[in-house]
Amino acid sequence: MALNPLEQFKIHTIVELPKLFGHDINFTNSSLFMMISVVSVILFLLLGVRKGAVIPGYLQAAVEYVYDFITSIIESNTGSKGLKHIPLVFTVFTFTLSCNLVGMLPYSFTVTSHVIVTFALSMIVFTYTTIVGFKEKGINFLRILLPEGIPSWLAPMMVFIKLFAYLARPISLSIRLAANMIAGHTIIKVVAGFIMNMHLILTPIPFLFIIALIGFEVFVAILQAYIFTILTCIYLSDAVK
């Protein structure tokens, strides 16, 4: 792992399980850290709301802040119509954020560095918003493919472009998140490996540089969860507005 910065993204089997319809369903390091991420969110929420005090403590205040934060994002993008979809957006944000931050721990595994995970999450968002769109607007939901004011001669090309862009949403959403996680962790690993090989880890400037890189990657982890959530709300706004 010290020589190969991409080794940290390799999936390893922890518990081998019988195949299901010819497919491997082994319990891997990805499965483990995904479970850790989910349990972390559940514990954060349960411990935060267990007392329900009028004057909240630090943990309850944190839970309330996250909830208010998600509510404000939904309202600013979809209006009051989108508030009933808080469970989806809240789950997307907390799960993505938890996976990103857990991946920053030493000897951990970054679940969101794998496109298959981010694509599955993106497909949930894509499918949900599409169903909501047809449920709210019926066949009129297809009007998002043809903006108002487009000349009739340009309409077929515009419909094709908009349809392609719409179907590409889960792909772009998933690749954006995974690519940022891979890039950040790889840079940290490469720089840290170089510094250690040069025996500079105990000198002040390289040590502080590594700390700064880690701090920046934590910021990126939070930012990417935020961007993923914002885009989810934007897609939701097409369905409910």
UniProtKB/Swiss-Prot annotation:
Recall the GO molecular function terms of this protein's record: proton-transporting ATP synthase activity, rotational mechanism
Going by the UniProt record, its keywords in alphabetical order are: ATP synthesis, Cell membrane, CF(0), Hydrogen ion transport, Ion transport, Membrane, Transmembrane, Transmembrane helix, Transport
Return the InterPro entries for the record.
ATP_synth_F0_asu, ATP_synth_F0_asu_AS, ATP_synth_F0_asu_bact/mt, F0_ATP_A_sf
Q: Which Pfam families did the record assign?
A: ATP-synt_A (PF00119)
Its subcellular locations are: Cell membrane
Tell me which GO cellular component terms the UniProt record holds.
Answer: plasma membrane; proton-transporting ATP synthase complex
Task: Give the signal peptide as a residue range, or say none if absent.
Answer: none
Topology of this chain in the membrane: Multi-pass membrane protein
Q: Which domain of life is it from?
A: Bacteria
Q: Where are the transmembrane segments?
A: 29-49, 86-106, 114-134, 144-164, 177-197, 200-220, 221-241
What is its biological role? Answer: Key component of the proton channel; it plays a direct role in the translocation of protons across the membrane.
> Partners and quaternary state?
F-type ATPases have 2 components, CF(1) - the catalytic core - and CF(0) - the membrane proton channel. CF(1) has five subunits: alpha(3), beta(3), gamma(1), delta(1), epsilon(1). CF(0) has three main subunits: a(1), b(2) and c(9-12). The alpha and beta chains form an alternating ring which encloses part of the gamma chain. CF(1) is attached to CF(0) by a central stalk formed by the gamma and epsilon chains, while a peripheral stalk is formed by the delta and b chains.
- Similarity comment: Belongs to the ATPase A chain family.
**What NCBIfam families does the database record attribute to this sequence?**
ATP_synt_6_or_A, PRK05815.2-4
Protein's name according to its UniProt entry: ATP synthase subunit a
What taxonomic classification does the UniProt entry list for its organism?
Bacteria, Pseudomonadati, Pseudomonadota, Alphaproteobacteria, Rickettsiales
Name the gene for this chain: atpB
